[in-house]
């Protein structure tokens, strides 16, 4: 499998975990290091795996459903780093309210002995 295909699969795994609202799947996608970072729309920068994991747990506990259709997907690669940019077209149910929104996202992956792991997710509302 080519590196580009591995990155596409790693990115798809992130969105599968997100849609499943499954913290165990999300744990598998991410590196568990202090250098990981995450910015959810409207949230401050979260630093380190513990803070990032807690944020996903909170989101999953308060979300009834989350469905993604990705568009404008681009994959860029370096030697041991790769990044994916995309538009997340989201249908969600949070606190019994259904919403449809579009979010710009950047996902940065780092190659490790375990494969490509997410080290940075940044998602911002399109204004």
Model-based region annotation:
Residues 31:
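Helix-to-beta-strand junctions that scaffold the AdoMet/dcAdoMet cofactor pocket
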Residues 1-25, 35-127:
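A beta-strand edge to alpha-helix "cap/lid" segment located at domain peripheries
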